[in-house]
Amino acid sequence: MKFNEKLVLNSYLLSLFGVSSFEELVKDLKASRLEELDENDNSLFYHQLKDNLIEKNKLINDDELLEYDENIVRHTKTMGRDIKWKYFQYLSLLFVEIYLDKYFDDKEQLLEDLNTYLREFNTNIEGKEKLTEYKHTELNKLALYNATGSGKTLLLQINLLQFNHYAKDKVKINKTV
């Protein structure tokens, strides 16, 4: 089994949008005009996702999507630069928003949801290739993969703001980092 076929969390996050592949999610997000904000400071990516995803298939509601978008825009403005995210950067930030929200809101539910998804994921895998269920202690680790030149340093700065937003009053943060 290829590495990219084992990305359960990625597959789970895609399923929240009612799609089974990254290509399916991004097919209508690649236009550079979507890198702008509307008059209410919502990204045009948000509108495209909200308007084009099939309502009956997606598991993330429009209010949650709006909240995540508002957080991304707010954190981006905090950087004090005119940053225009490419679709893959925006989705990276959006996936982190979703994960952190679920993690800090209800870790047990996140664990249950991931393992339920993993059991279904494993039905198409044979023998030794089957993936083991997540453990509670593994949920505090999140790995992102972005290509060379994709703005990882800038994304990481926003990821820190995202973490601080969701962790506020929930965990003691080691300030030495």
PLM region spans:
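N-terminal helicase ATP-binding lobe
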Residues: 1-177
